[in-house]
């Protein structure tokens, strides 16, 4: 282990040493670049772009490009990037993570690698955690730096229409949020008009701000485009009515994992309540699903901690557990959101199914090069390396850190802890020192707020309930006498600047109300103080009644704290390295567990990723192709050849003419397509291979039908383009129809696959095998349905106008028994699965 850590440490030092060599080359060009006139910068950019096209690499262009960007930043913003910011910029260009402490200028640092990589003509996306930050950089002086350099800059936010998004994505540099970027990707892969695509270039390079928040904290939260499903409102209400009758003996909560299940006594009670024999019978699967969601909603989900209730608009709002922000428009999936609505007595909205989905883990791995910035990534460097192939390189601060980080104060009860917190806060507030109080939940922030009101201490609250005032509150948090309560470091991404005279008072004082599951979040809170060499102070107040202690320490930690207080000089508060280490050990355990869980989920999600890429790549080829007729013909030929071959090999008499005609006309062709005498002649000709002959004959029928359909449009020049559009539209709609069903099938498979462990089988291997079977079955159905729909479709009747009306596809839900049984066999998937 020591050798492994030593190797990592040495590799980090080596990367920094190489970065210094490059940064020195940048500095050597500063005097030369400073002689340029303002108008020369855009000219220089054009020259560098030309050099790249002529064969120069970005690494070769880096020193001059960075020197230009640095001088441009100085002229436009009045701020000169420090040497350490050049180091960070080099690390970003190399596709790694630059860990830069709060206030060290990550915003300016990103300009240099963004400018350099945009010289290639490929898209550069600078990704922020919220729209406020994206707009601030685009509209402000940072965007002006790029414009000064002759680069185009775009902004991508959810209020932009399709045309605005298309223009933004064509810019050299795009400022965007992670969520909007991901949803645009999903929406693009549901488009049926190529002209509507917003991202028409490859995903080349992304710089992710607060990279740990997006790629670690939000990794488990998939982006989902939903569709309405069959209503089951009454089941939600009945399930909620049932759980309200339960006592502690009826259910069991696992605190560490926050899972809940009915006990045997609870199962019996459910069966009596719903008047059924066996809750776990397959016929009661929907009821069981609703009961489980009702249990989660009632006993593991807490208002003002996991979600907010907006009674005015009658809706449940998710609280981001890592930022404390509300997430309007987002829903808990799989019916949990509706269960919470039932719990809170709100109108139950329609449950949704998945139309398209992707996780941030898999979305950001689409980029050819990925880099990121944050003040807190070192604790998660193993995950960044394993999942994203990025190293975390600590960038030294420009000025030494002088913040004082005091040991934790520890208490037995929450009351003792809060009393001590208010005591210290009051003492510091009296001398005018600004104070930032960090909480882990909205609920705790409001408890602290009530206590401050009792002491007549004016303060601001920054949590999910008032996130709209975030920038305004943070801007004032460093002023004299300011007291700010922030949940899970809401306000991250905006510096807290000290007001006049605050340095003399000791700078910003940060008081944490408890330890978070992740050391990173604690470090983010501490990092709000002591920016750029400013003085600062931080201390955490923890108790044995804190959630982290309750989940992992139990009564053991309470006994330890009680013992320490007895031997301490203070009656209540005391500090102990042993207890601090104990909590740190818990945090490491949770972090390791969360990492393992994210890896576990990623392993499953990678199966869907491979399938999604196959579908989306083939779909896009069809969408943008101007040769869709040829694509469709090739697909039909292979589909028919396969079907005919299967029919021949399954028949004792290989060419039963009437049976063959009936089979093909039922499955693919319009009635009376085939002539019985012609088919008999083909089958009975001793000089030819009847299988090959009939395959060629049937494909000629395909070409004849397609030509007759096309002839209908050729008669009217205004409608000539509709034939190709019609083929494309039908093909894409069928792909989407089946793929969306497949996503939900895979979701159901994932939820149910855990039960195979009872049969001593590996659940992942079983998921992989059955997922491949589902995928191959879907591919076959897509090919069959495209062939049948187009051959049987009457363009003359239905395509008098462009194809905007709904086409009703063949219902393929009535599978034969063999396809209903999931089989485990090796499945091969290709880049063009149905070709």
UniProtKB/Swiss-Prot annotation:
Its EC number is 7.4.2.8. One of its GO terms (molecular function) is ATP binding. It catalyses: ATP + H2O + cellular proteinSide 1 = ADP + phosphate + cellular proteinSide 2. CDD domains: DEXDc_SecA, SF2_C_secA. ATP binds at residues 85, 103-107, 495. PROSITE patterns: SECA, SECA_MOTOR_DEAD. It is found in: Cell membrane; Cytoplasm. It is a peripheral membrane protein. One of its GO terms (cellular component) is plasma membrane. Residues 820-835 have a biased composition (Basic residues). Disulfide bonds: none annotated. It is an enzyme of class 7 (translocase). Keywords: ATP-binding, Cell membrane, Cytoplasm, Membrane, Nucleotide-binding, Protein transport, Translocase, Translocation, Transport. One of its GO terms (biological process) is protein import. Its main location: membrane. Part of the Sec protein translocase complex. Interacts with the SecYEG preprotein conducting channel. Has a central role in coupling the hydrolysis of ATP to the transfer of proteins into and across the cell membrane, serving as an ATP-driven molecular motor driving the stepwise translocation of polypeptide chains across the membrane. Monomer and homodimer. Part of the essential Sec protein translocation apparatus which comprises SecA, SecYEG and auxiliary proteins SecDF. Other proteins may also be involved. Belongs to the SecA family. This is Protein translocase subunit SecA. It comes from Aster yellows witches'-broom phytoplasma (strain AYWB). The gene is secA.
